[in-house]
C-alpha cells in the first residue's frame, strides 16, 4: 500500500482523504474521506507513516491576495479573518508535524471548490462528503 494524503486544515475538523496508489481501479482508490480533529490527523499520519508517499496540505496562506469586497461590516470581516488565520495555523502546524516525523509533504495553494455531484463523477466514492473533505480529496488527484 502506498498512500497519498490530502488535508484541508480547519480548527475544529480538518478535511482528510487517503488515496491508495496501488489499487488497480483508478476510480476506486480512495480508502478514507472524512473529517478529523487535529490530534486524530496526527495519530493517523503517525500510525500510517510507513505507507505515506506524500501529504498534500491545502495552504491558503500562500495566496497573497484576499478579497474582502463581499463581506459587509468591519466586525464580520474581523471574525472571518480570525477564523481564516486559525485555520492557516493548523495547516502550518500539520506541516511542522510532517517535517518532524520525516513524512514527505507539499503545501498546495487552494484552487477552488467542487460540488458533491462533480466529485462523485470523478470517482466511485459513495459516502457523503462535505466541502472540506472534497477539498482534501481533490488535493491528491491534482485538481
Question: What annotation goes with each model-predicted range?
Answer:
Residues 2-143:
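Phosphate- and other anionic-substrate recognition elements at nucleic-acid/protein interfaces
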Amino acid at each position: 500500500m502506498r498512500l497519498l494524503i490530502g488535508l484541508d486544515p480547519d480548527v475544529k475538523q480538518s478535511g482528510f482523504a487517503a488515496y491508495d496508489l496501488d489499487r488497480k481501479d483508478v476510480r476506486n482508490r480512495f480508502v478514507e474521506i472524512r473529517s478529523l480533529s487535529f490530534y486524530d490527523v496526527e495519530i493517523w499520519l503517525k500510525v500510517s507513516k510507513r505507507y505515506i508517499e506524500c501529504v498534500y496540505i491545502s495552504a491558503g496562506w500562500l495566496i497573497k491576495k484576499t478579497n474582502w469586497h463581499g463581506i459587509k461590516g468591519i466586525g464580520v470581516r474581523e471574525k472571518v479573518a480570525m477564523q481564516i488565520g486559525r485555520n492557516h495555523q493548523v495547516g502550518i502546524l500539520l506541516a511542522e508535524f510532517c517535517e518532524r516525523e520525516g513524512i514527505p509533504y507539499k503545501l498546495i495553494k487552494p484552487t477552488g471548490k467542487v460540488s458533491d455531484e462533480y466529485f462523485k463523477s470523478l470517482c466511485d466514492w459513495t459516502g457523503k462528503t462535505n466541502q472540506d473533505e472534497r477539498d482534501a480529496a481533490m488535493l491528491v488527484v491534482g485538481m
